Amino acid sequence: MSLTRRDLSFLLPALATAASGQETAKKEKPVLAAKAYEYSELPVKTNGENQSRAVFDGLTHTGYPVELHMTRLAPGQRSHPPHKHVNEEVMMLLRGQVDALYGGKTTRVTAGSTVYMASMEEHNWTNPGPEPAEYFVIALGPKT
């Protein structure tokens, strides 16, 4: 089946609508306003012995994606299997210790430490114990 220019002219508005729909889907995150997030009011998501709290997921005033979550990682547990993604992450360890995997090596960090994870860097966090580890992760940039 061959398409004429006339056929294509009928398809153009549909393609434009579909493309704008994709742009709208990408921009559904809200622009974040100044706000205090009370720890006790954040919903808790449980995954086995681990817990996480989503704090916010939105856009800065310039449209830059930013997301913050908190995790309580039980002794001997890992955050997730090693993986990589486009966005960058900053992990700030509040309590405990974590073995941070990145760049093909593992580095043990203690409370008060920060780990920066570059785009497309395979990573994960493991709690060597004996106490729970609590940390914040700030994800910067688009996830895809």
Question: Which functions belong to the PLM regions below?
Answer:
Residues 69-84:
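Conserved short histidine dyad/triad with adjacent acidic residue
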Residues 78-80, 99, 115, 119-125:
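Histidine-centered metal-chelating micro-motifs
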Residues 105-119:
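Short acidic-glycine-tyrosine-enriched beta hairpin
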Residues 66-69, 114:
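Aromatic/pi-system hotspot detector in well-structured domains
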Residues 3-7, 11-65:
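A short, N-terminal "cap"/entry segment at the start of jelly-roll beta-barrel domains
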Residues 86-88, 92-98:
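Glycine- and acidic-residue-biased ligand/ion/polar-headgroup-sensing regions
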Residues 119-144:
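Ligand-binding loop in jelly-roll beta-barrel domains
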